[in-house]
Amino acid sequence: MSDPILSIRGLRKAYESGTEALKSVDLDIRRGEIFALLGPNGAGKTTLINIVCGIVTATAGEVLVDGKNWHADYRHARSRIGLVPQELTTDAFETVWSTVSFSRGLFGKPRDPAKIESLLKRLTLWDKRKAKMMELSGGMKRRVMIAKALSHEPDILFLDEPSAGVDVELRRDMWEVVRKLRSGGTTIILTTHYIEEAEEMADRVGVISHGELIAIDEKQALMARMGKKTLEIVLAEPMASVPDALADWDLTLTGEGHLLHYQFDRHAERTGIASLMRELADLHIAYKDLSTRQSSLEDIFVELIHNRRTAA
């Protein structure tokens, strides 16, 4: 990888209780990409983000922004980063306009009403500019948080569970905004519980569990490497269990005995499907329909976390 915009080296966070929230994490973020950091609750996602954003102090390790040590020039490095936290923390009595403008000033940026206007319009907040924060819905407050994070024109934007509390329509609008930001050159690192969104939007994916990065790759490469393909057979008559004669096949039975699943290696020279169908015919097991299903990113995520817990 050439010239990552953000480099994390040996990042570790340990508390006096003995808990290790991060265990020597190494991560490079490419300029202009959307990177999805996935993990269960308590995995270390928010801790990592908070360290990079200067909210939490690391026990060990370093953060480089454009190759420069984060601590060596904190003000400059922090001005390059925007953060949309999970919590909706705003002054309830301030207007949308004041909230976003004040955030810009905190980073030493001069007043620029034209830029604030453009930002609010991009996020469909212009009509709400005079509204007080306490008058907004949860979804609109989330948009204001994004506007705050972008007010000082950062190169890197962290989105920590940005879809939390947002309805489906607003969520779609929000992700469209994210796509446009990425098209404009903003580097985006997001965490989300909506893994199907990460599958749709991310260029690369990292999975963190118990403070360790257990997988990181191009999204498509990860899905090709770890994804599995399943043949789903809709049976004409339900079965109580998989017959002993089919014990050598990787079969599972669901749907109250109506649905037979065969998991096969899509990279193998032979999938075995033709042989399986012949054996079903020999056993006089009739079927009504066939279909195949490729593992989703969520399937892969669940398997990775399960394997990690089993190994632990």
Where do the model's predicted regions map?
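Catalytic Walker B motif of ABC-type/P-loop ATPase nucleotide-binding domains
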Residues: 157-160
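ABC transporter nucleotide-binding domain
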Residues: 175-265
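Conserved ABC transporter NBD signature motif
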Residues: 61-72, 76-77
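Conserved ABC ATPase signature
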Residues: 132-136
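Conserved catalytic motifs of ABC-family nucleotide-binding domains
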Residues: 153
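Conserved ABC ATPase "signature" region
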Residues: 101, 105-128
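A short, flexible loop at the N-terminus of ABC-type nucleotide-binding domains that lies
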Residues: 1-8, 12-24, 74
